[in-house]
């Protein structure tokens, strides 16, 4: 809520100067579930670890997914404090193809991007894998499906679903090897590059961020 309040202050300041401005409340509901939240152990969410939260059923049964249920808590807070916003969901953004051209450009330049990420923050992962995670066609997990090759002419990535370390936890992969079409199949950019893609696609002029995103 704090980030939204600060961004809303910038929006109001711009409007006070005569500019048109809008606040986008963006739900990263294509991100995978990394752990079961405290107080929710009894809902059987453990089996969904690694799956996009928008593909996990709402354990309370009142929204179309676990992700939308959690998003609704933030939106309720924004409504209560009177913040005006436009709500957007990651799953809709990707399904509608709003980032497909950005994904194509990023994957074509993945070597340069991997080297730059390593240089700036010391993370070498994207020198080995593409900065794009397809949703595994077999187990529906995200972070376990690591893409190693981009077929430019077909706009497809080749990936293997294998065990992946997320923090101190190991998420089990199913071993599936496949291809995913970035224009049709579900998947998402790694957040370090997705940040830039969203700024371009939505014409974002201000958003709080840390130095690891630069």
Task: Show which residues each predicted segment covers.
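N-terminal Rossmann-like or analogous alpha/beta NTP/dinucleotide-binding catalytic cores
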Residues: 1-114
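Alpha-helical recognition segments enriched in aromatics with Gly/Pro capping
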Residues: 109, 119-214
